[in-house]
């Protein structure tokens, strides 16, 4: 695969996990596919989420990865963006609800800390009064504007397609 110099990905929830998983993937060709990423309340540590999540989502990672058993733990480690943050070299923007019970803010904060320690360009916006998904119109607009700013100004530096 040839890296697409102008390709970025930004997704929410399990999509945020997918974004982070692609950027930290063991295969360098897949890691290099995206120039930057965005994670809206995405999972960064599936193992800790599987151990400590609310009842409604308690079996979700069984379907997404596998049931968390001693025999499957390595699958969780292999797919954990925060545990594989050392592989990531692309800028990432993060958006998180402060009252999120599905993907707690600590998930995002661990990833942000790991990337900042590596010197990776990051943007982190924590929205007070928001949960898993944003409901307040002002916060939705703020997130959209911040994501556009991040990709346009910090990543692509205002370059426009020919």
What residue ranges belong to the model's regions?
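Active-site-proximal cap/loop segments of hydrolase catalytic domains
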Residues: 1-162
